[in-house]
Amino acid sequence: MSSAPPAPRVIAVVGPTAAGKSDLGVFLAQRLDGEVVNADSMQLYRGMDIGTAKLTPEERGGIPHHLLDIWDVTVAASVAEYQRLARARIDALLAEGRWPILVGGSGLYVRGAVDNLEFPGTDPEVRARLEEELALRGPGALHARLAAADPEAGHAILSSNGRRIVRALEVIEITGRPFTANLPGHDSVYDTVQIGVDVARPELDERIARRVDRMWEAGLVDEVRALEAQGLREGRTASRALGYQQVLAALAGECTEDEARAETVRATKRFARRQDSWFRRDPRVHWLSGAAADLTELPQLALMLVERPVTA
């Protein structure tokens, strides 16, 4: 007598950029009668296709992909809004008896979707004062203040990322607690299996360089030029996306196109390291090799992990 198929659960496919998350997500959705829910913060933006490595309709293999192309490039990203949308979609899929396959490398977005994470509110006066100070003094001065108030946040947030520095300082002022104290523990709101795709740094760096080359060949500069006409340069979040920020600088004459291309590779490698560090801190992530030598085994190993009767 065969056992009944497992009841649908949430699967989160996580890890650094260029590790192979998207293809694994499609495979799992095909095998489990699931649908993909995007957890890449920049794939939420309409028209940002080449530079975010968004799967083409053909590459999606007939699998519905949710939360792609939902915001204009002028809209500032909101993890709280993403959380609302992602949970509504996850709840709907589970109610239909389908497996939600959350795919992406934006760590806070993954946590927002599946974990007990509440977002502190905002205070327009505090935000305006901090943004004015950012404009006058620059991000370095505010980052030094953040590092003194919350060393862990100072380490995690780049000294050049004025938007995130302002938000962290705003949360500290509103709550009276360190910014990192407002991040959740490892309390899931869903029965979730988290799969991390692991690729050794030398191989991942090579993949990133090749991916950036393919993006340029596919017309990233033209994509950015078209989005600039739609307000990309004024978009607080979208204009900072890897590749887009560098091409915007080239279009403004601040660097050459070759320099923008090289900086995109460097910045993406740095970003991949931060992504990897973020997910390594979560003991719930089951890591599987996504190395080229193991690619044929990865899908089946992931499927076996998901179909275990007991999750960790």
Curated annotation (Swiss-Prot):
Cited InterPro entries = Dimethylallyltransferase, IPT, P-loop_NTPase
Q: Output the Gene Ontology terms for molecular function.
A: ATP binding; tRNA dimethylallyltransferase activity
Q: Which organism is it from?
A: Streptomyces avermitilis (strain ATCC 31267 / DSM 46492 / JCM 5070 / NBRC 14893 / NCIMB 12804 / NRRL 8165 / MA-4680)
Q: Would you kindly state one Gene Ontology biological process term found in this protein's UniProt entry? A: tRNA modification
EC number(s) given by UniProt: 2.5.1.75
Keywords of the record: ATP-binding, Magnesium, Nucleotide-binding, Transferase, tRNA processing
Q: Where is this region: Interaction with substrate tRNA?
A: 40-43
Where does the chain bind ATP?
G15, P16, T17, A18, A19, G20, K21, S22
The top EC class is transferase
Query: What is the purpose of this protein?
Result: Catalyzes the transfer of a dimethylallyl group onto the adenine at position 37 in tRNAs that read codons beginning with uridine, leading to the formation of N6-(dimethylallyl)adenosine (i(6)A).
Name of the gene encoding the protein in the UniProt record: miaA
Site label Interaction with substrate tRNA, positions = S106, R127
Quaternary structure note: Monomer.
Tell me its cofactors: Mg(2+)
Q: Which residues bind substrate?
A: T17, A18, A19, G20, K21, S22
Give the protein family. Answer: Belongs to the IPP transferase family.
Protein name, UniProt field = tRNA dimethylallyltransferase
* Reaction equations catalysed: adenosine(37) in tRNA + dimethylallyl diphosphate = N(6)-dimethylallyladenosine(37) in tRNA + diphosphate
Pfam families, A to Z = IPPT
